[in-house]
């Protein structure tokens, strides 16, 4: 059985605030990745219909919030079916982030892992939106602790466990531990467009910059011993104009793209797409899965390098609904 799988990490700009157009572009990128031999293609956080960067520019924007809601993806929707069909046609796994609109109208930071057979193998919500994101998105619940799906890549590669988390979920130690104990081998770290670190005088948080976010993805690789597809989007002038973020905390100038592939020991395996983070494209890498086994022999934090007699994780996967019938 083969032990090498080719993966694709997008670094692309969505069609801002336009769900149908963003999904059409995503399908095109899926086909492009598959035509180049990839078996997994990764997209960034809320790639459809784009990350709502205005939440970091002003306290509230009712008009944009409303437009965003109308362009958010719903479960079992035609847009999801388009992605499933593309995955099935090309026999490629699709891991994508999106804004999810629930039946009640609330929005959530959603993720889906679609199998090469075109089935939604996993759909989850970000457990706790980060800071200003909470002005738009709600919290996930118990079932969203599930963040790993076992995908069938056929007789050549067999089954591989693929996992995903959103953005600063990579700063949540217990959540990361929970994913690692699910046996993740290839992890997709979804991030929005992120700006480079401008220097020590920067008034914001280093951990929100490209350097800081990549550091969190690399840390997850070291902790898990898994390959990490570090996926960021791009925000160019069209996004800045659509969201009016030029004077905000993020998305002030074109850029945001810093996608890469990270090995299970934490090293970066790929080069930047171009000199400018505003460049769009796809990062490719061939992953030798035997390296996961090698790293596990040194460090397995849920196995031989753990002390469950002293420290352990307890969790509750029950969904917490707003209305519950009691007899």
Curated annotation (Swiss-Prot):
Optimum pH is 8.0-8.5. Optimum temperature is 38 degrees Celsius. PROSITE patterns: CN_HYDROLASE. Keywords: Hydrolase. Residues 5-289 form the CN hydrolase domain. It is an enzyme of class 3 (hydrolase). It catalyses: a nitrile + 2 H2O = a carboxylate + NH4(+); 4-chlorophenylacetonitrile + 2 H2O = 4-chlorophenylacetate + NH4(+). One of its GO terms (molecular function) is arylacetonitrilase activity. InterPro entries: C-N_Hydrolase, C-N_Hydrolase_sf, Nitrilases_CHs. The keyword Hydrolase applies. It comes from the Eukaryota. Pfam families: CN_hydrolase. CDD domains: nitrilases_CHs. Its EC number is 3.5.5.1, 3.5.5.5. Nitrilase that hydrolyzes preferentially phenylacetonitrile, but also (R,S)-mandelonitrile, and 2-phenylpropionitrile. Belongs to the carbon-nitrogen hydrolase superfamily. Nitrilase family. This is Arylacetonitrilase.
